[in-house]
Each structure stands twice: as C-alpha cells, then as structure tokens.
Amino acid sequence: MKKAIFYLLACVLLPVAASADEGMWLVSTFRDVIYPQMKKEGLKLKPGEIYNEESPALCNAIVAVDGGMGTGSVISDKGLVITNHHVAYGDIHSLSTPAKNYLEEGFWALEQKDELPLKGKTVTFLRQVRDVTDEAQAIRDSLEKANSLGIFGTRKVYGILERKYGGDTPFEVECASMWKGKKYLLFYYETYKDVRLVGAPPVKIGAFGGEQDNWGWP
C-alpha cells in the first residue's frame, strides 16, 4: 500500500445533458469499441490521453472509493478527491457529534491541521489491464481433464493467475472474466489508505433531490 495522503471532498454533483447512447465499456478496450463514435460526437482527446498505462492520462484521475463502493475524481496535484455526498455519508455521520454535527452543518478544513482522518477509507487506482484469456482457458481445460474443476472452477482459475502474476508486482492483482467467460483479464490496482475529509456541504444540500438518478444511470 502506498503511503500518501488523499483528501476527500464530498459534494452534490448536478446532472448534465447526455447522449442517448447506452452501454458500459472497459476503459482499456474503448479505443476499438467506442472511440470512433465518441470522436464523431465531438470528442477532441486522443485515445492515449484518455487511457494510457505508460504516461499521464485521464484514467489516472479516476479512483474507486472503498474498493468500488463509490467512485471519485482527483482534481488537484495535492491528492484532492471529489466524490458524491452519499459515498462519504457514513464517514461524515461517524465523525459527527452533538457539539460538531458535520452531517447537518457541513464541514470545511481551512488548514491542513483541520483535516479529519477517515479510518478504513481507501482510494484505489487502476494501473494496468492484462489479457490472459488464452492462459486462463488452458488452466481451465487442465483442471477439467483432472476432474478438479468443481463448482468453484472459475475461482480456482482466478486464484492460479492471481498468485502467478501478483508476486512480482507492488500492485494488487485481481482476475475477472468478461462476456460470459470469453475474456479473462488481470486488473492491477494501487490502493491508498491515508484518506482525510476536507469538505462536505450540509446534508440538506449534499443529498438534495435524493438518489433516484444516481441509481438509474451508470
């Protein structure tokens, strides 16, 4: 785990106009799948400016909060992360007291000494995606021939690959199958544990309008 400080800013994010095109794509594969349509719709960025494992790109600004329970965006070179209010709701609630009701009144750290540590909070970056489909299918075939696949066969395949590739990297390695087993991918993650609350509006503002749109759209 990296020892760096990340500052969480919980905000209400307003909806914006969106195209009717639907679907979700892996960021590592968007170049061939959806980029031509994105460019046609007016996108000015080059593929390498959106996803790049070797150089700075837009993907480096996107984080998973608490292992994927929420998402956020890095908006400064000091590690400031902005996220939805509901992602930090439980943390704000746990930090609140009758004397300092941050949930109802909001909170802003005007100086670094005012930041509030969020115990157990994590932010995670995706650093690399590796296609291991051929190797995974070979492992699966071998397990089937040995009659040792069992009902947890897919998890066995994941475990073999995670152990093989996870030992020589500082990142966390997680295997997953996509498109009903047609693709097997390894995801390399970098997780930071020193996360601190620096700002949150009062709950009446942060949670205004409820969560209907949030759970209805990706």
Language model: regions and residue ranges:
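Terminal presequence/propeptide segments associated with secretion/organelle targeting
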Residues: K2, V16-P218
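Sec-dependent N-terminal signal peptides
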Residues: A4-L14
